């Protein structure tokens, strides 16, 4: 972005989803601002919002979840460093972006820190597209179900009792 803009080019950075939710939008803008390069941000629909809607899984629901956490399962150093006890709150949905490769480790830690092994989980591959695949399970068995279904990235993980609503709210197929 900076290199081309400094050459006088008009540059468009097209990002699927919302550039400010695990999209490096903030980091890129910091660089542009340091060089006094003008820019504009057009926010998109975050993957969590789009994928959950196309999967028939509301992220919040008065009977199930009054809060929702967005987390990344992809780390600079490759080390998962969540504050695990904070992820275990009742009536909360946890959404994990880019977490397919670390699903087994995250599952073990969630159970270790007190989340029920029967907590509903959805893993959605290629959400909002005609290739969308949704695998539903519980913490205790989601890894084996995902492996059996041969899910690949991009995938979003949704954890919480809201996942149970999919059986009645699924409209996309």
Regions flagged by a language model, labelled:
Residues 3-74:
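Short glycine-cluster motifs
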Residues 6-12, 24, 30, 67, ...:
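A contiguous loop/helix-start segment that scaffolds small-molecule binding in enzyme catalytic cores
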């Amino acid at each position: 972005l900076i290199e081309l803009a400094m050459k006088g080019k008009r540059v468009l950075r097209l990002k699927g989803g919302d550039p400010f939710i695990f999209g490096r939008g903030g980091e890129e803008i910091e660089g542009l601002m340091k060089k006094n390069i003008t820019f504009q941000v057009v926010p998109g629909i975050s993957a969590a919002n789009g994928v959950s809607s196309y999967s028939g899984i509301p992220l919040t629901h008065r009977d199930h979840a009054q809060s929702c956490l967005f987390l990344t399962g992809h780390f600079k150093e490759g080390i998962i460093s969540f504050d695990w006890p904070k992820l275990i709150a009742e009536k909360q949905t946890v959404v994990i972006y880019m977490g397919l490769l670390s699903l087994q480790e995250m599952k073990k830690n969630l159970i270790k820190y007190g989340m029920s092994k029967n907590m509903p989980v959805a893993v959605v591959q290629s959400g909002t597209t005609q290739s969308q695949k949704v695998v539903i399970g519980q913490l205790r068995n989601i890894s084996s179900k995902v492996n059996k279904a041969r899910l690949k990235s991009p995938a979003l993980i949704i954890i919480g009792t809201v996942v149970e609503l999919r059986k009645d709210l699924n409209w996309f197929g």
